[in-house]
Amino acid sequence: KVKPLPGSGFLKTNIDFCIDWARQHKVRAAVYGVCFIAALEYFSLPNNSLRELQRKNPRITAMMEQREQEADDAGARFAVQQTWVPISRISPHLVHAVIVAEDGTFYEHSGVDWYEVEESIEKNFEKGKAARGGSTISQQLAKNLFLSTSKDPMRKLKELIIALRMEKLLSKKRILEIYLNVVEWGNGVFGAQAAARYYYGVPAASLSASQAARLAVMLPNPRYYDKHRQSSYLIRRTGLILRRM
């Protein structure tokens, strides 16, 4: 008869406890699992590139490259419309509208809104697919600069890690400035200055509150709203953001 290894009963008891706990707390278990994998991934992501952003403006982003490749694969023409401007030359209305629409706790979190992460995981479990993102402005910037629009869980994990690093290296003002200059606002349209010119024929500094609210509402799906500018949802959501500003 084979004798059990010393301590094997204790180990089995603890493993069983962990399994039972995970079954009863699926969302929390998923969050802790993500955090554990994040710790393993932490040292493999762009740190030097983030440091450079303290003083250098990015010339091209992963999102721009992705859109260019998609157009090339489809045999379509594609040109990036973007003009960099300092945040001092972007309408305060737009800055406020984007924060209200995309990340109401921007000045309170450290790159990741963990409550939103847990909520999105719970919603995605319920629907059985990646239906809700819960991304902060910092996470969105990480995706735009270094990653892609893929819904691969590992991509999302890297987004979280980069966002946390970014907040340690860059000020909130700098994060906003970069975000507002590189975020996608339509087919080939990137950044506030290009968006203001493209949709309203004015510089970013001259955007009104209503124009800013409309642009902010477009951010989750800019290429769709570029083609559906009179969408009833877009109009309703714009009114809501205006009232919150």
Describe each PLM feature range:
Residues 1-244:
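Juxtamembrane regions of bacterial inner-membrane/periplasmic proteins
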